[in-house]
Structure formats: C-alpha cells, structure tokens
Amino acid sequence: NNMKKNLVLLALGALTFVSCQTQPKEDYSWIKKGLDAASAQLQLTAEEISSTNMLPRSIRTGYDMNFLCRQLERDSLTFKDSLRAQPTADQLGKRRLCSVYDWTSGFYPGSLWYAYELTGNDTLKTWAIQYTNLLNPVRYYTGTHDLGFMVNCSYGNAERLAPNDTIAAVMKETADNLCGRFNDSISAIRSWDFGTWNFPVIIDNMMNLDLLF
C-alpha cells in the first residue's frame, strides 16, 4: 500500500513538473498590432495637418452636464464657468489643433520619435524631424514652465535618436529660459503667467526639470 501511494505521488509530481514546463508561450502579437495601428494613425495625422503649421492636441468630444454633476457631487453653477464650450455638431470627433506655444505641443513629435524607435520606419523619422523643427521658435519663449514638456519630448528625443549639431543649442537656450523663471526669494520656478495668480507653482514643475540636466 505504501509503495502504491509512493508511486501515485511520484506520478502526480512528474505530471505537475511536466505541466509546469509546458506552459503555453505568452502571445504578444497584440503589441505589434497596437504599434502598427498607432504608427498608421500618426502618419495619417502628419499627412493631413502638414500644411497647417499646427500640432494635434486632442479629439473634440462633448460632455453631459448631468453626468459631471453626479461625478463631482456639485451643482453645475459652481463649476460651469471653468468648462470649455460644447463643440458644435460639425466639430465633434474632429481634431483640435494647437500652436507650437501650447503646453502639449511636444507630445506629437515625441510620439513620432517613439514610434520610429520601435519600428525603424524612416517615414516616421522624417515626420518626426519635420514636426520637431516646427517647435524651433519655442527656444525663445519664456512664458511657461512647460518648456520641458515641449522641448524634451521633441528635441530631446531627436538628440537621442538622430543627433545633429543644432539640437543641443536649442535645448540649452530653452533650458536657460526655464531657469529664468526661478525666483530666488521663493526658491521655486513660476509655473505660468496668466490669470490672477501671484506666483503659481504646481507639481508639473518637477516633470519639466529634466530639461535642465
């Protein structure tokens, strides 16, 4: 009986070992499909807006005021002034573009650079260079702390993936402008210059500091 039990236990152990060794391999094909879809969308966008000298910011969508009130547990009178106007019917689902001075302007060229890095697709690289160069005037801009977002995502990735002699100068000049927003008395970088704020400082400042190093 003991021998039978031992044999059964041995057999179960062997089956467990074999099953552990023959686990199916993870299917990562969905990653490639996602990357292919993202790359195609990035290229399509690049082609469609190339003559505008603008950058894609978001897709225009509407909002349900009742839903917002339920989520915020507040009356709409307390926050409706802070909402953007509802897009018109012909604007819904369309791209919202922005100028090079918008705080999100570096994200699109940055996305092109990352897609190029992952695919090796030279068409993506060409578009990345074009949309990065579009941000050249930002090197003279002093009106926001978001210079890190704007320039690191674009020129920072360009320096990493396709370096040339002009990129470092753009990044240094922009970094100098970001340093210029530092106030010795307060020991902080001023976040922005609009509105009625005295000296706004938000956590995003930390994410822009990488440009200084």
Each PLM stretch: what is its role?
Residues Q23-F213:
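Glycan-recognition and catalytic cores of secretory/periplasmic carbohydrate-active enzymes
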Residues N1-E26:
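Bacterial Sec-dependent N-terminal signal peptides
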